[in-house]
From Swiss-Prot:
Function description: Component of the viral envelope that plays a central role in virus morphogenesis and assembly via its interactions with other viral proteins.
Spans within the Virion surface topological domain: 18-47, 99-112
Organism, scientific name: Porcine respiratory coronavirus (strain RM4)
Designated name of the protein: Membrane protein
Family, similarity comment: Belongs to the alphacoronaviruses M protein family.
Cellular component GO terms, alphabetical: host cell Golgi membrane; membrane; viral envelope; virion membrane
């Protein structure tokens, strides 16, 4: 995709016409009115013209973009995070529509090279969009959590306690999982996931769900203080397979719950 973008920019810059950086109020002539040597004119494509005339507007847009990308996390602001997710969800259909429209317009003027680039971009965008939906549905099938449709979510931590399943989106698969209990509140990866917990409610295993499999982490060590309901428990990888992460409330044993298939 980056290669296609670079090629498109190179073609736009080398095949452009003569543009004016400063225009008069009546037409498209240069500001000093000369046709040959105008210091306010340059020979470049549409891309350079846009940068020269809209550089301040683009800088404001990019500042907003940087702010959303850098601080679009739940621990900073849920509002900014929601804007970031909305942008990421809308990018696929917008880019797909733009590439299809550009392919049609290039075909109309018999610019078949750019038409080919536009078709290739549309195909790549559509394939990536379908892959996103496939992976999200696979992850939702395992966790029944709407975090599965977060474009940034590659894995979901699932903790079953008190007959409920608590989930936390992750960017990758951790080597080990640490659950921290502070005054009855359960934390994972620095986020509060449950309240009203005691040391007896800590699970014997936790799971990390991926689109292709579920990894089981077994409890290997803990240090708890019963009087203040404070402490920690550490889990390491023990097995992986097609396991469900849903909390079970029937009378199955721990091993039967673990082997419950999706």
């Amino acid at each position: 995709m980056k290669i296609l973008l670079i090629l498109a920019c190179a073609i736009a810059c080398t095949c452009g016409e003569r543009y004016c950086a400063m225009k008069d109020d009546t037409g498209l002539s240069c500001r000093n009115g000369t046709a040959s040597d105008c210091e306010s004119c340059f020979n470049r494509g549409d891309l350079i013209w846009l940068l020269a005339n809209w550089n301040f507007s683009w800088s404001i847009i990019l500042i907003i973009f940087i702010t959303v990308l850098q601080y679009g996390r739940p621990q900073f602001s849920w509002f900014v995070y929601g804007i970031k997710m909305l942008i990421m969800w809308l990018l696929w259909p917008i880019v797909l529509a733009l590439t299809i429209f550009n392919a049609y317009s290039e075909y109309q003027v018999s610019r078949y090279v750019m038409f080919g680039f536009s078709i290739a971009g549309a195909i790549v965008t559509f394939v990536l969009w379908i892959m996103y939906f496939v992976r999200s549905i696979q992850l939702y099938r395992r966790t029944k959590s709407w975090w599965s449709f977060n474009p940034e979510t590659n894995a979901i931590l699932c903790v079953s306690a008190l007959g409920r399943s608590y989930v936390l989106p992750l960017e990758g698969v951790p080597t080990g999982v640490t659950l921290t209990l502070l005054s009855g509140n359960l934390y994972a990866e620095g986020f509060k996931i449950a309240g009203g917990m005691t040391i007896d409610n800590l699970p014997k295993y936790v799971m990390v769900a991926l689109p292709s499999r579920t990894i089981v982490y077994t409890l290997v060590g803990k240090k708890l203080k019963a009087s203040s309901a404070t402490g920690w428990a550490y889990y390491v990888k023990s097995k992986a397979g097609d396991y469900s992460t849903e909390a079970r409330t029937d009378n199955l044993s721990e091993q039967e719950k673990l082997l419950h298939m999706v």
